[in-house]
Amino acid sequence: MLPTVNNNIVIALDAMGGDFAPLSVIQGASFFLDNLVDPGVEVFFHIYGDQKEISPLLSKYKKVSDNSEFTHCSDNVLPNDKPSFALRHRKDSSMKAAVEAVKKGKAFGMVSSGNTGALMAVSRFILGTLPNIYRPAIASVCPTKTKSFALLDLGANVDCNTDSLFQFALMGSIFAKIALKVENPEVALLNIGTEEVKGTDSVRGAFELLKNAPSINFKGYIEASEFLDGNIDVIVADGFVGNVMLKTAEATAGTFISLIKQEVFNSWMTKMLVGILLKPKLNKALERFNPKIRSGAMFLGLNGIIIKSHGNSDAISFAHAIKFAVNAISENLNQKIINGVSHIE
């Protein structure tokens, strides 16, 4: 049964994490309540942070205040804190308190825009992993020219063995069914070629396990040059490769969009022509790559739902990260991962 208050889904919020916190967090919660709650779903927040900063915001955003409980925390995790430092010395941080709310059953998930490494360390220490899961992985939804796909690991594990990559594929497949609404997700391993003999020992070992796993719709290897084609639903890599791939893609997309705007809008004539002829289609195409509606990475494999929003998230971005958490809870993601792993074991 889901943790609820008066039948509401409960989400813990780290109000002090992120470049624009706590304003972005409280505004994000307000935007979520006003615009992103599905019919029949009610959400309640446990908010953790500095009372001097949070109280005026809760007075201003009445709907958030009416649908939340606030707890003061005397400390917060800083962007440059090492994971070990945050774990040992930030004892009364808003991040730690929000994760502990999940551990204690006060909430079933938490959202933070704070330090990624610290959040993973704190979450793993407090919550632990799901039964039979070796390592957690960071997963996110990425756009392509035709559809979205799930990518993991995005940095939790710099080096992975065969069994971890296999479990990432399993968790990624279950995650994609929920996040992408795909009934039988197609899964691929990221590699330097599509031939079976290529890749590291871990990647080749995972290939052998996956091609003999009936519960996973495995399609073999995929190269980085192919991932934007939209032919695969889940791409699996170790955290080092996955993180580099994601950041390279984000930087390339950002540069390309900037170049288009620079060239297209360099004169009043082209501005007018684009406004008349192309603006609706251009906006529709660019919306697919809008990071604000994809602001959320999930820490898969932990014994609780943990969502990491971008560090520079604004209110809309943070609201969509909350939505991400609510969907995972509503779909009972972790129980489905437990069931999936038990069938393999």
Swiss-Prot record:
Q: Which pathway does it serve?
A: Lipid metabolism; phospholipid metabolism
Which SUPFAM superfamilies does the annotation name? Isocitrate/Isopropylmalate dehydrogenase-like
Q: GO terms for CC?
A: cytoplasm
EC number, UniProt record: 2.3.1.274
Q: Which biological process, per GO, is one annotated for this protein? A: fatty acid biosynthetic process
Please state which protein family the record places this protein in. Belongs to the PlsX family.
Question: What is this protein for, i.e. what is its function?
Answer: Catalyzes the reversible formation of acyl-phosphate (acyl-PO(4)) from acyl-[acyl-carrier-protein] (acyl-ACP). This enzyme utilizes acyl-ACP as fatty acyl donor, but not acyl-CoA.
Q: What interactions and quaternary structure are annotated? A: Homodimer. Probably interacts with PlsY.
PANTHER family xrefs: FATTY ACID/PHOSPHOLIPID SYNTHESIS PROTEIN PLSX, PHOSPHATE ACYLTRANSFERASE
Output this protein's name: Phosphate acyltransferase
